[in-house]
C-alpha cells in the first residue's frame, strides 16, 4: 500500500510545483524583492544601492550626474593622463618589430557549460570559466582571459564602439580582459594590486547575413534583458568571435574604460572587424538597466554605454610587425564601419523606373536619379536584366557610362519571355547604391517587385483592367495590371531583396522555373487585381525610427490612384488616428516596462495566435471580407526588435480603441488602401512554419450560412483567395471572429501547459524511480538488473605494431602534427574524444545515491567494468562499502598496471588506504597540490609527522625528500586489525609495508608543466622504484583523469620505446579511455605527451651514477659513424631549444632594450623575474634576470647581469620584492669602471629606493685555500612605511673559476655559498657582467654537487639544458659544457678518496699512471 501511495504523493507534489514554477517563470514580478529568488528583480532596490555605496564602491553611469564627466570625483584615476579609449590615427602609428603574432591557447576549444553571461547594468559581461591564454604581441608574459564585455550605441547600427580608427567608430566593441595568472588568481585582484593587465578590443561591423558564431551570444543576450539577470551560455568558440586574421593590430598603453580607470592596461586593438547582422544587433538594443539619478531610480534601455574618447597625451600607438598583415587596403574596413544607410550604400536606389516597348524586339528602360547621394559623385549606372528560356536561367548586365543618360534600350527581346529589370548606381571606389525596384515585363504586362517576397492573389477581379500602368508599391508587395484569364497561386519567399553590400546580385539565380510557373506565365495572360488595395511606403531613409511603434488607422476615404506623396501617407478619420496615436504612445511609455517584462512570456502565445490566424484565413478563403491589418512584428509587440532583418519602421499595426478588437471600415463599392507602412500578408510553407508574426485582432462580417461548412470542415488548401462575386473583396485574407479567438488562444495555451506538465511528470517519475526507490530497495543480488554492472564492454584493443611509429620517424611525425596550426593534434584528440561515444559504458555504482558523496566531482565517474572493488565492511552499510572512485588502467603489455583514482576526500581516507593495502601497492604517484588557485584539490591522506590511523591501517611518515619539482615521501604502513575488529597476530612482515609517494608539485590543474625534462625525470624515477612483487601503481591528481592519464601514457610509452623502439600514443590512449573517462583531459596535455616523448628520444637517459661517471664520459667522447661524438650531440640539444620556451618579448621592448648589457643574453618569458611595477611608468616591471632551477626549488637561483648605473635601483628592488638574502658577485675578465663596479652604498650614506633604504652595516673577508679572498658585505634593507627589515649578505668573489688553480678548488666557493644558503630564505642572486657563463656554471655545479650528495648520481645534460631554457645564451661553447663534466669527475674522484690512478695538475689535466688506459683518462676531454 505504501508503495502504491508514493507515486500519488509525487504526482500531487508535481502539480503544486508546476503551478508555482509557472507563476515564477511567467510572472517574474511575483518573485521580485526576495533574496535568492529564481528571477531577481531587474529594478534593483534602494537597499542594494545603499549597500553598494556603504561598501565604498561608488555608483557611476554613462549619463546624467553620474556620467563619465563626473567619474573623476569618485575615482581620481579617471583624470589621469594615460586614459582610454582613444582614436587611433593609422598613419601616425609606427610598426614595432617586437609586436609579432598573437598566440592564443584554448581559444579554439568549445566553451564549457559553466560559462555564463550577466547584465551588470553597465554592460553585458561573459564570465569565462575555461582556460584561455594570451601571449605574444609584446605582452610581458602569458596572460589568462577572464571576462568579455560589450559596448554599443543607440540603435540601428549607430556608433557604439569606444575606440575608433581614423575617427570611424563601429556599432559594437567587444573587449576581452586578461591578467597574469602566475601573480594573481583573478583579474579583479590584479586591478586592486595595480598590476599590469591586458585587453583586446574587437569591432563588430554590420553585414547582410547573420554571423552564426554569434548565435550563442545573441541567445544569451535575450536571457539577460533586465539588470542583474544571469544565464548560462550555450557552447561557443571564443576564437570565432575574433577577426579571421589576427596579424593586423594596434598596441598602446592605457587604462580601464570604466572606474577605477587604472592606467595598467596593455591594449590590443584589432584592425579587422567581425560581421554582425542588423537582426543580431537588435539583441543589444533590447538590454535594460536601472539608472540612479539623485534619489530616483528608473528602468531605461542600456544604450550608448561607451566612454568618450580621451587625449593621447604624447603616448605612442604602434602597429604589429606581422608580415603582410597590413598589405590590404584599409578603405574596405574604415570607409563605412557603422553599417547605417549612409555606409551600406553610396546612395538611395534609382527611382521612377519604367519599362516601355519600342517595337516588337526592343524595350526602353528609364529611371530617375537617386533622391539622396551619400558618397558623391555617381560615376555610372548598371542595368541588369534576366530571363528564363527552356528552363535555363540567363542574365545580362551592361553599364551606362554617363551619369546623366538615364535611359537604356534593350534590343533582341522576345514578346513571349518574362524579363526582370533593375538598375543600380555606381559611385567611386566601386561603391554602389541599393537596387531599384525590380520590373517584371512580358509583352503588355508589367509588374513591379521590391523587397523579399513576391505576393500574388489567386482570383480574377470583377472588372479586369485594360491598361499597362505601373505604380510603385511597398516592400514585400506587388501590383499586377493586365487582362486575361484567372489563375491561382501562393506567395513564394525569394532572396530578391535590395542589396546593401554594394555588390551586384544575381537575379537569374532567383527567378527559377518554379517561380515563373507560379507567376502564371505559361502562355496565358494574367488577370488583374485592383491596384488600389496595395499600399505604398515611404523611403526607408525618410521613415523616422521613433514612428515605428505608433499606430495608424485606416479610413473610409479612398486613396489616390497614382503614385505620389499624397498616397504615401495614411489618412485619419475625424482625428481619431492622432488621438489614438497619442494615447498609445503614452501607454507605451507608461507600460513599456511591463511589456518588456512580459515579452518572453508572450512570445509563444504570439506564435500560436499567428498560426491559428493563418489557418483560419485559409479555411475561410471564399468568405467576403474587409481590409485587414498587416502582419504585426512591431516595436510594441517585439520590444523594438525586427524579425528576419526587416526594418522596424515598415510594419506598424493599425490600432483603434481596445487592443483586443480592431476594426476597419470601408465603403461597399470602393476598395481601400492599407496604411503606408503596412505590408500585405504573404504566407508560404516556410513562412507559415517559421516567420508568421502575430496579427492584430479585427472584426469582420459574419459568415454566410452557406459558407459555414468551411469553418467546420477546413480544407488543407493553403491558397488565399477572394470571392469574386463579393463587391467588398478589398483584402487578401480574412480574420477569424473574436469568438473564435476567445477559445483558440486558451486552448493552445492549456494544451502547451498540459504537455509541459506531462513531460515534467514523466521526468520526475523516472528520477524518483531511479534514485529514491533504488535508495530504499537496493539489494546486492545477482537478480537485480539495477546493480549488475555491464562488464562486457567493447574495449578498444591495443593496436598492433603496424600502427606504432618507429622512434626514428617520430620526429617527422611530430612535425607533421604541429604543421597547419597544430591541426594534426586537434584531429587526433577529437578522435580520442569520440572513441567511447558509441560505447554503452556504464557507471552505475558511481551514480548510486549511497556512493555519490564519495565522488569529488559529479562528472568524474568510475566505469563499472574496470572499477576497483574494495572488500565490503561488515555492518548495515556493507553492501555499498566496496565502492571507491578508482579504475584499473592497462600499461604497456600489462593489464591492471595502474589504478587511476581521484584525490582522496577526508571521508574516503579509510577507503583509499584499504585499496592501497588490498592491491599490494608500493608506489603512489600524486600529481596535484592540496590547494591550487585557492581551491581544495586534494585532502592530505598521509601524516605530517608521527603517525596517523586510517581505519585498521597505521601510517607513519618516515622522511620527506624535497626536490625542485617533486617530493618523495616514504610511508610505513602497518595493519593492526582485521575487518571484524579483532587483533590480528603478526606473521613476520606481512602486516607491515613501505609505500613510497612521489608527489609532483609543479603541474597546474587542467594544464601542463612549463618544461618536459623534470617530468621525464619524475616519471623515470617513480617507475624505476617499482619492483616485480608490487601491485598496481596508484596514480591520482585531483579528478584522476587529466594529469593522471598524461602520466600513465608517458610512462607506458617510455617502456614501449625501451622495449620495441616504437611509439603509439593515439592507439594506447584510445585503449585506456575505455577504462576510465577523460584520461588526458585536454588537447594541451595530449601535445605535452608528444613533447616529452620527443625530449626522451632525442636526449635519451643522461642520468649517471657516480661509480659509472668515468666510463660514461669516455663513451660519449667516442666518435660515431658520422664523426661526431655523443658529447657534441648533447651540446647541440643544449643550445637548440624549442622556440616557445625561449620567447623574450619583454627584453625586446623599446623601453627595456637599454637595460640589457648584451641583447643576446636576456631572460625568457617563462623564467623572467618580475618587479612590482611603479605607477604611471612603463616597463618598470622588467629587469634582466632569470630564475634558475636548483636542486631543492624551481626558483632556487636567480642569474642576472652586473647592474648598470641606471638599473642599480631596479637591482635592489628585485632583492626587496623577492626577499633574496644572498648575492654572489662574480667578476668577469673585463674590469668595470669603479663607479659602475660598486653598486652598493658606502657606510656613510644609505641608498634611498623610495619604498625602502639600503644600508651597509659591516664588511669582512674570508680567505680561501689558495690565498684568495672573498669580501663579505652585510646590508640591511629597511622599509620606509613600516618596520619590515631584510638582511642581505653580499659575497664579492675573486676570479672564478680560476684557470690557474686545481679544479677541486672550484667547489670551495660553492661550498661556502651552499652553507650560507642553508640558514637563509629566498633565492640566491648570482651575477657576472652579462649574467652568462660564469653565473651559469656556478649554478650548474651547485645543483650537480647537491645531486651527487643526495642521490650519488648526476645529470649534467639536464642541468645545463634547463639553464639554457630558462636563460638562453648562457652556455654557447662546447668547452663550457665540457668543463661541467671535468668538474664533476674531479668531485667524484675526490669523494672516492683516491680511488683510481688519477691525479690532477694545475690545469685540470689528468696525469695517468703507467697501468691506466689513456682512453679512460680525463685527458680525452681536452
From Swiss-Prot:
Principal subcellular localisation of the protein: membrane
Domain Alpha-carbonic anhydrase: 58-321
Comp. bias intervals (Acidic residues): 577-602
Membrane topology: Single-pass type I membrane protein
Site keyed Ancestral active site: positions: 1328
Domain Tyrosine-protein phosphatase: 825-1096, 1127-1387
Keywords: Disulfide bond, Glycoprotein, Hydrolase, Membrane, Protein phosphatase, Repeat, Signal, Transmembrane, Transmembrane helix
UniProt feature, compositional bias: Polar residues: 624-633, 641-652, 666-679
Residues on Cytoplasmic side: 769-1422
Extracellular side: 20-742
Pfam family, one: fn3
EC number(s) per entry: 3.1.3.48
Disulfide bonds: 78-261
Residues covered by region (Disordered): 541-708, 1396-1422
Catalytic activity: O-phospho-L-tyrosyl-[protein] + H2O = L-tyrosyl-[protein] + phosphate
A biological-process GO annotation: neuron projection development
Enzyme class, broadest EC rank: hydrolase
Residues that carry a glycan: 109, 113, 156, 359, 444, 620, 632, 640, 728
InterPro entries documented for this protein: Alpha_CARP_receptor-type, CA_dom, CA_dom_sf, FN3_dom, FN3_sf, Ig-like_fold, Prot-tyrosine_phosphatase-like, Protein-Tyr_Phosphatase
Domain of life: Eukaryota
Transmembrane segments: 743-768
A cellular component term, taken from the record's GO annotations: membrane
Residues annotated as binding substrate: 1005, 1037-1043, 1081
PANTHER family with a match to the protein in the record: RECEPTOR-TYPE TYROSINE-PROTEIN PHOSPHATASE, RECEPTOR-TYPE TYROSINE-PROTEIN PHOSPHATASE GAMMA
Name this protein carries in UniProt: Receptor-type tyrosine-protein phosphatase gamma
Species, as recorded: Gallus gallus
Lineage: Eukaryota, Metazoa, Chordata, Craniata, Vertebrata
